[in-house]
Amino acid sequence: LYSTTDPKQIISTIKKRYKPSIIYIADLDAIIDNKVNTKIINDILIDFPEINFWIDTGLNILKSKKRFMNYHSVFCTENSIGFDIDSNNKKKYVCSFDYKKRILGNVNLPRLLKYLPKKIILMDLEQVGSSKHANFKMLRKYIKYSTKYELYIAGGIKTTLDLNRAKSLGARGVLVSSILKKDCLPRLLIQKRKNQPTN
């Protein structure tokens, strides 16, 4: 799919082919070494204002050039020592529940509920980047919260059957890096997405 390692060129390719409204970015340097790729992220936010970016910097602060309307910080439970989120800024945040047979981090879900933003990613780390399929058992476990929160599933989405099953179970959306990497989305679905008006 990509003939480059330049993030901006990759995003341009994805934008042209799939017309996404949201792109998730995990800054691995920030997550692993606490070194945020500030310049690259700022450049991306400037160059693609029409796309909303969910960006995981491992709870590190991004020093942005300005207040970007398309920047949404991702908070992950795996690195949490018991965080809450300012209720005044919930709309700009996304919470990722990192899951490995249980939610990782110092998280008491019932106590945390009142602090959570509307958008929540259920990310099964055992499925991410693996040959395993999505953990729909995890989704069914937490789907009771879908009336109040928008649930997105990550890890193991390999086919359009997985997409349809996630939707039927109540997921608001999915992270689909494996499908894009393998170029598995059918042309009809791509064309349908391209024909949709931009929000």
Predicted regions and their residues:
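Short, electropositive alpha-helical surface patch
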Residues: 31-53, 140, 150-151, 171-178
